[in-house]
UniProtKB/Swiss-Prot annotation:
Natural source organism: Buchnera aphidicola subsp. Diuraphis noxia
InterPro entries found in the cross-reference section: UPF0114, UPF0114_bac
PANTHER family recorded: UPF0114 PROTEIN YQHA
Keyword Membrane carried by entry: yes
Bilayer-crossing regions: 15-35, 53-73, 136-156
Protein name, as recorded: UPF0114 protein in repA1-repA2 intergenic region
Presence of keyword Transmembrane: yes
Principal localisation: membrane
Domain of life per record: Bacteria
Alphabetical UniProt keywords: Cell membrane, Membrane, Plasmid, Transmembrane, Transmembrane helix
């Protein structure tokens, strides 16, 4: 009976597969939004101010960072929780695939969130005259919370690896 339960629990990991497929659809939508922004900016590019262009570029960077985060979560989640990806051509296999554990994934996600938050904060600062000080302060506090969380997670991971080596 125990063996059947263990097999059922182990097989249930495949329930995550539709989640990763859904994330790939989210990535497609994000890609469409990226190119939509480029297409809509082209007619206005010559009349646009430098700061306006920087804001558009920051939006594109933001989308690229979120897209990278999605790809990382899809690939690493699939490889760590469902099945190893069988990519025959090692030259096409991404260098980090198959080498990251769950803690490494969490640290990568946390640093990606900090990068995304940094872009949002920079965009906010560029439009600071239009935004209430309270909102800016709240965004800075949220960003600092992300930064401290990322540092905390990295520190805990480092300590747990060091402790594991000592034992």
């Amino acid at each position: 009976m125990e063996r059947i339960i263990e097999k059922a629990i182990y097989a249930s990991r495949w329930l995550m597969f539709p989640v990763y497929v859904g994330l790939s659809f989210g990535f497609i939508l994000l890609t469409l939004k990226f190119f939509q922004q480029i297409v809509f900016i082209i007619p206005d590019i010559l009349a646009m101010s430098e700061s306006g262009l920087v804001l558009v570029v920051l939006s594109l960077i933001d989308i690229a960072l979120v897209g990278g985060l999605l790809v990382m979560v899809m690939f690493l989640g699939y490889e760590n929780f469902i099945s190893k990806m069988d990519i025959q051509d090692n030259e096409k296999r991404l260098g980090w695939m198959g080498t990251m554990d769950v803690n490494s994934i969490k640290n990568k996600v946390a640093s990606s969130i900090v990068a995304i938050s940094s872009v949002h904060l920079l965009r906010l600062f560029m439009e600071a005259e239009k935004i209430l000080d309270d909102k800016i302060m709240l965004c800075v506090i949220i960003h600092l919370t992300f930064v401290l969380s990322a540092f905390g997670m990295a520190y805990i991971d480092k300590m747990s690896k060091k402790k594991h080596v000592l034992h």
